[in-house]
């Protein structure tokens, strides 16, 4: 697997993609990118604003372009948005242009990690657990479909998970 130069992290909200990605990039001396941060940088607004103004569909169009651009780079670790996996184009780009690591976590951990985060538009509802369960039912099979490696993140620090990824990839 080591012939691919990019590492792409996929998984649900609260799996630790951004935090683990930063550790992984630092440990491997690679550039780190976060697709949500790149969208915010390009629009000059936060994700919640993009959702409010353009809706989820408008956000997904932006996300598809950002992921297409970032996956063309070499020598990067990319943390993708949790919903990016729903796009066939994004799945194809991730699979073709790097190693895909699925960061798996439980609904309980997702709830605990995201409950105070107001920057997650899909969770600004009365029952975020129900939303997370519905998203998992749709998205988890897609994460599994393109994953080269699956790593559980529930009870471990970001640094430990980053080390596990490095071990599994043989770096």
From Swiss-Prot:
Pathway(s) per entry: Metabolic intermediate biosynthesis; chorismate biosynthesis; chorismate from D-erythrose 4-phosphate and phosphoenolpyruvate: step 5/7
CDD domains membership: SK (cd00464)
Catalytic activity: shikimate + ATP = 3-phosphoshikimate + ADP + H(+)
GO MF, any single term: shikimate kinase activity
Cofactor(s), by name: Mg(2+)
Tagged with keyword Kinase: yes
Cellular-component GO terms for this entry: cytosol
Compartmental location: Cytoplasm
Oligomeric form and interacting partners: Monomer.
UniProt protein name: Shikimate kinase
Organism annotation: Shewanella sediminis (strain HAW-EB3)
Source taxonomy: Bacteria, Pseudomonadati, Pseudomonadota, Gammaproteobacteria, Alteromonadales
Gene: aroK
